[in-house]
Amino acid sequence: MSTHVRHPIWLPALRPADARTFASLYAVESFARATISSVIPIQAYEILHNEQIVSILYTIVSLLGLSVTLFMPMLIRRFARRWVYTAGCLMLAIGSVFFVTHTLPGQLAGMCRVMGASALSITLNLYIMDHIRKTDFMQAESLRMAWSMFAWTGGPTLGIFLYTRFGIYAANGAVVAFALPLLALFWTYRLGDNPSIRPGKSRPINPLANIGRFVAQPRLRLAWLIAFGRSCFWTTFFVYGPLFM
């Protein structure tokens, strides 16, 4: 009797992506972003010694991030979502490497991690729309915001603690410690595009062509104003709070 028997290899079966899947991804991502959010303005002020120049630096980086966000659909069509998400995780980690140089060019390059955050946000929202049913969307978003609350509540405090007690390497090392597990978690979930959703045959090449259609709809304008106002508040809080405390 033959003793060489090939037994089947049992691959781990993953359950379909649900609300907890995206809540866990967003929570780890939030920790990677929130931990350093309160340290960046302090480090920029230590380099520039002027609050106004720090504001100008943030404005320049924000405009660069906005330009990349507008062209993110082109990148997704060219390289696929999973690779754009992967690039976003790596940009968070690489940005921290630039921060530890404690120089103005390194600060500017590190703050460009906002492009990675944009890639993560857009691709994650696309995955959510593919895998979460419309009837479950409210519950999924509530769970996602609730889990990220822990990151944005404790993350900035953790970053300041590490920066003041253990130095710049510890604060930025925490970002890498969250960004790399985020990448591993994403590939563990094996998220893919919903095969039942097919892209349209005619797609605008220029993303700016859709701005007029967006502005023409009152509900979209209101949603944008709410999101923009909230973003302005929290950005002001995280940037100027550490500077003037």
Language model features with spans:
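Residue-level signature of mid-helix packing/kink "hotspots" within the transmembrane helices
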Residues: 62-70, 152-153
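Helix-loop boundary and gating motifs at the non-cytosolic
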Residues: 5-62, 221-227, 231-245
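Hydrophobic core of transmembrane alpha-helices in multi-pass small-molecule transporters
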Residues: 27, 105-120, 228
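Cytoplasmic helix-loop-helix junction between adjacent transmembrane helices
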Residues: 113-148
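Structural signature of the two symmetry-related core transmembrane helices
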Residues: 83-97, 176
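Juxtamembrane intracellular "pre-TM" segments in multi-pass secondary transporters
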Residues: 2-19, 191-226
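Symmetry-related core transmembrane helices of the 12-TM Major Facilitator Superfamily/SLC fold
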Residues: 171-188
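Helix-to-loop junctions at the C-terminal end of transmembrane segments
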Residues: 68-80, 163
